[in-house]
Each structure stands twice: as structure tokens, then as C-alpha cells.
Amino acid sequence: MNDTKDNKVYSSARHSKYWQKLKAAAESKWSLAALFAQDNTRTQRFSAQSGALYMDYSKQCLDDTVLESLLNLANSCELSARIQALLQGAMVNTSEERAALHTALRLPTTANLQLDNQDVVADVHQSLGQVERLSERVRSGTWRGFSGKAITDVVNIGVGGSDLGPLMATTALDEWADTCVEVHFVSNMDGTQLDNLLKHLNPETTLFIISSKSFGTIDTLSNAKTALSWLLATAKLRAGTEDSVLRRHFIGISANSEKMSAWGIHPEHQLQLWEWVGGRFSLWSAIGLAIAIRIGMSGFKELLAGAHSMDEHFAQADFAENLPVLLGLIAVWNSTFLQVNAHTVLPYDGRLSYLPSYLTQLEMESNGKSVTQHGDRIDYDTCPILWGEIGSNAQHAFYQLLHQGTQQVSCDFIACVRRYSDKAKNTPLQQQHELSLANCLAQSRVLAFGNAAIAETDSQIACDADKYKYYRGNQPSTTLLIDELTPHSLGALIALYEHKVYVMASIWDINPFDQWGVEMGKQMAESVHDAMQQEGNAPFDTSTNQLLKHIKQLS
């Protein structure tokens, strides 16, 4: 279906009677301890499952009446129609007049989707075929560097969505790696990452992937330029040419083939993106080449299949059982109505170490907006500040604030039920995994119930008169349990959060697919950089001018 010209104006949740009901409900003094005491079926009713993902949201500060109002709020803004518009290629990115078809990147070959008279599914699978061919050449050792040696290391140069997604996924799925080719990631513009990495790599056996949708991102291109210089310095000593270095040591991934060619990427090593793929939603595309190299194309296809299964759940499940809808509505309830303006993601699994950073970009860059799609200034809270860390590490870092600070913070606990199943039972590794699961459940319990959670097991601590030992509880949280971390379940988990973002944006009536807030800083950086190269006074504010003067004096 081609619906890009559909400029439908949807009903606004802001003007719904359910918005006012939720505002009134938010004035109540919510007590999680009381909610659980009043209803022994609460957990069964306030939980849902899709495939390998089980979600318990019973520790959120809401009841049946609030949940019903949230579901009605979703209907009031025509969320079902908005979901179909997203999936069918409507112009949901209104400011840039584009579709946002990241879900098309994981459609099976049997699907049918047309956009501007172009067969999207055929184009996607043609690109996946190219990803498979290039990745297998690297994995099999048939891709050779300028000196004829097989590639041993691949460096993905990108930033934002061109870095965080592949980095997060390859780290999470590293135990599925079935190749001796190592994959590395470089994003920092100051060169520190790249400089430290190159000291340990062999120029003759290193392949670089330059990932940039525009192929104009200064962070990425400055690192790519340094990488090329490093390669050429060695190639000249080995009678290699610049052409052989560019042909054998660089792959480009971008929506701008002209810029790739101008930089020197050979056409057969260019992978195309589409304008309807946003950077933070792009790991399913050719941007995922590094993932395919590391875990193989079969694993990458399983990642796509897992995401597609969540797409189908999102499109078909009743809202009351729909994980992305529920997760998004709860986030709106917390941020907009309860004014819980901080949210933390706490995976109790070291393989998910980069998930919090990935979700920080996904949510804050998507929904950190203060203007509606129609240009109206927003008078309600939207996206909360989001951060996170591996749960066991966070316990020794910022859990003190969660338990006894003055800020209310909502939490997502994430854990994998099965791990080390290939080991004999009760091994030290399995014991460690059980300990991690126990900590996950324990922390969510104490955050919810505070001292009341301890009273049942240690009355002395619970009744201690020392106020500095008091746990107030009542911190809202959701717990996501994954049967087992696999490419399929990881794909479903990531898609769950993608769709959560869209649900929130639909309620808030904002565009989650642009990021105009990052543009002015880039433009100003160019002006500041020019001023660094010039003599005399800079034309900025006194603070910036003084800082520039100090830098010049020390340079």
C-alpha cells in the first residue's frame, strides 16, 4: 500500500475526557503496598506476554480505573489507525515528509508493500542479499586486503544509530559468533577510540565499514580520514596503491551514493539506505552488516524475524494485552500525569550492557520534543530523562538515590530466565546467574514496598528507629523476563521499545522520527571551529570568547 500522500489529522488525546480523568487520578496518593494488599489477583491481571517476553507491570502506581482510562486515551487519539499508518508506509514523519518504514526491513519475502510505486520488500531483500554476500566473503576469508592477506578485523565507523545499534546487538549476541573475525566500533570524534584501537590492528588485515546515512557526518568522516591515512602509510611501504586500499579496505553504507563515490568507496562495496529509515531505527538494514559479519547471516535473519514477530503482535493484539501499547501508556502515565521525569533501564545480564545507551538515544532523540506535529507548543511533560546500567553495577552506583533519594524514578528491570543451559546443572556460572536473578527480583520488591518488604524477613531492620536506614518504597517499575537471550528474542525486545516510543509519541501528538534539536549545535560548531583558526576576537558571547581565548593561549 502506498499512503505517503495521506495527510490525515488524527484526534488529539490532549483534548479527550480521559486526559482529564487521568489528571484527576494522578492527584491521588498512590501506595503500591496498599494496591497489592487490596487485590491478590493484581499480578495475574497486570502482566502480559508475547513470545519469549513476559512483562509484569503490577508494580506500577496504577489501578484498573487508571488502566482503563489509559486504554481509552489510546483509542481517543486513534492509536489503531496510527499503528496501521506506520506499518503501511504513511507519511508519519511529517516534518521531513517521509514514511518511517523500519518495520519493512524485517518483512518476509512473501509480504507486499509498495511505496511511491516501488516494491519495498523486493528492495529490502535485494539489500539483505548484498549484506549476506559481503559478510560471507569476510567471514570465509575470501576478502583479502591490499597485500593479499585475509581480513581478521572489521572496524565499524559510525555515530548515533550507525554505531549504538550494531554495537549493542553484537555485544549481546557475541556467544553466537562463529567466526574468528573480530568486530570493533569507533564513534568518538576526538580520535581517542580510533587511536587506541589502531595500535593493536594490522593494516593489511583490517576492513573499515563507514556507516553514515548522509555520508556527511563530521564525526564519522574525520575518523574515516584518519583510518585511510593509517592504511596508506603502510600500503606505500608494501607497494600498495590508494586505489587498492580503498577497494579492499572500505565498505560504505549510506543513502547518498554520490558522496560515497566521491570519498572513494567503490560501487560494488556500497550498501544503500533509504530516506525512510531513521538512523536510530536502522540496525535492521545494511547498517547491521557488522552484526551479520559477527554472528552470520542466519543469526541476523533470526534477529529480523524476532522483530517482525513483535511487529505482528503490535499490529494485532488487543491493547489490553499489547506489550508495546501497555509499556508506552505506562510511560505516559508516569511522565505526563504523575510527573515522574526520570526513567532508568536496568538489565540484569552483562550481555545487555549497551542496551541502556541504545534506549537512551531511541527514546530521548525520538520523543524529546516540545512542539506537536501541528506546530503547537506543548504544555505537558513528554519524554523523561532516561539512563541505565547493568543492574548489579548500578546497585553499587545509583541505587542509593533510587531507594533513599528525593526523586521519584520509574524503572525497567530486564532479565533472562535461562542461561548456561549447555552446562552441567548447578555449576558456578549457573549459581552466578541465579544470584543475578535473585538480585533483580529483590531490588524491584524493595523499590516497590520499601521497609514493608523487609518486615516479613527481618523485623529488627524494618522497625529500626534510625531514619537514615529507612526505605520509603513506592518507586514504580516494570519487570521484563526473557525466556532466553537469542537473536530472535533480542529482536523482539528491541522492536518492543521501538513501538513503545511510537505509542508515547502518538499520545503526545509529536513526531518521533525527526531530530531537529541536534542540528544547530553542528552549525555552531563549524563557526566556532572557524574562529579557532583565526586571529582576533571571536564574534560570540563573552563566555565562549573567553574559553576560545584560553584554548588559543595553550595551543
Swiss-Prot record:
MF (Gene Ontology): carbohydrate derivative binding; glucose-6-phosphate isomerase activity; monosaccharide binding
InterPro entries assigned to the protein according to its UniProt record, in alphabetical order: G6P_Isomerase (IPR001672), G6P_Isomerase_C (IPR023096), Phosphoglucose_isomerase_CS (IPR018189), SIS_dom_sf (IPR046348), SIS_PGI_1 (IPR035476), SIS_PGI_2 (IPR035482)
| Involved pathway(s) | Carbohydrate biosynthesis; gluconeogenesis; Carbohydrate degradation; glycolysis; D-glyceraldehyde 3-phosphate and glycerone phosphate from D-glucose: step 2/4
Gene Ontology annotations of biological process type = gluconeogenesis; glucose 6-phosphate metabolic process; glycolytic process
One Pfam family it belongs to: PGI
UniProt-listed Enzyme Commission number(s): 5.3.1.9
Q: What is its main location?
A: cytoplasm
Annotated GO CC locations: cytosol
* Active site, per annotation: E365 (proton donor), H396, K522
Which terms are listed as keywords in the entry? Cytoplasm, Gluconeogenesis, Glycolysis, Isomerase
Task: Say if the entry is tagged with keyword Cell division.
Answer: no
Task performed by this protein: Catalyzes the reversible isomerization of glucose-6-phosphate to fructose-6-phosphate.
User: According to its UniProt record, which protein family does this protein belong to?
Assistant: Belongs to the GPI family.
Instruction: Return the PANTHER family for the record.
Output: GLUCOSE-6-PHOSPHATE ISOMERASE (PTHR11469:SF1)
Q: What name does the UniProt record give this protein?
A: Glucose-6-phosphate isomerase
The protein's organism comes out as Psychrobacter cryohalolentis (strain ATCC BAA-1226 / DSM 17306 / VKM B-2378 / K5)
